[in-house]
């Protein structure tokens, strides 16, 4: 879609932003859009990265290459490990440290608007990749923030209004890892023994091109693919040594929920989730992972002989709710590989016997326990009702408005609030905005027939 297709709409949408943008350092106005295209000279970054969204062609399946959207990265300043490129089409991994100051220059070389959201990172509002800050082809946006997160796994992805799900499906996503002093004392597996695993399911045309949801219903409700990709690659097999590894798993799928388990029935050992490292390791028979969720798993291949394999799979499960209510059996939601079916995800092939391996700590990091005494809004719980009407998702009965908010949605910064989040119908979706990858509607119209959830 061309730049001119948005001019009238954006003029009406962003007129009110002029005064605000002029007051913010580094912000300029482009057709009454707030564009943060200049670095703040007072901000002294420890890490500086250039990130470019562009079209690329990559080999995923045998035969023709697949056309994708891709983040290309370049490290301008900082430790060499701050940026790590993965094979496949996903963006580079950003490896950051607590307390670092980070500057990222985002360039858009796509023919449609885009903006980047740092999912799970604690950053100022104007650095979070809100859709109001989207940029067009040939423009740039400058992000500057200090890393306040504790050690854990996060990610970044497109956050363009009504295009989020489609752009992520095409490839605009990547991992972020954060480390801190507490984590470094634990001696967890690192370097080549710290493995990122981005799980995605995709549909392909006969010509090996991504096939995004067909029709309004699939784009609104999400859909399942029939090919499982790990780090952008099909039929994934990873060579490992007979020692302990740290697996960082992200569900980057459109709508699929995985029930993670080992093919030999061994339990899983979780050491971290979306919020970071756990207080202590948790041993579980399986782990459910919804779209946008992350989990960190400790796996020890010690005692396994070279030539053997261990497969991480999605175990069979029942009881999936269809988007319009009612239970589903083994028929897929919007076709594709059936939800709840059992299938392999990635094989780990033991190729080398080694004797040195770290031990799993009994304790990881202390976590402060919150109580009712910590809450600032005692007796005034904030309600967030998730619903749907007229094919648009709603929060508290309202569709998304770029600059509109209810009084109850204004939360004082640095306070602990009690919030009740609930569904007022039977729609399915994970926390953190899923729908998010599930293609849920941001509310009020479409761009080119593609709808994306705003809650990511």
Question: Residue ranges of each PLM-predicted region?
Answer:
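N-terminal secretory signal peptides
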Residues: 1-10, 17, 21
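Histidine-centered copper-binding motifs that mark active-site loops
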Residues: 4-6, 15-16, 29-302, 318-320, ...
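A Trp-anchored, charged/polar loop motif used as the substrate-binding/catalytic surface
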Residues: 229-233, 400-405
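Extended hydrophobic-aromatic, low-complexity segments
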Residues: 258-260, 308-311, 321-323, 393-396, ...
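Hard-cation-handling environments
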Residues: 314-315
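C-terminal substrate/ligand-recognition segments
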Residues: 383, 388-391, 404-435, 455-456
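Long intrinsically disordered, low-complexity regions that are acidic and Ser/Thr-rich
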Residues: 434-456
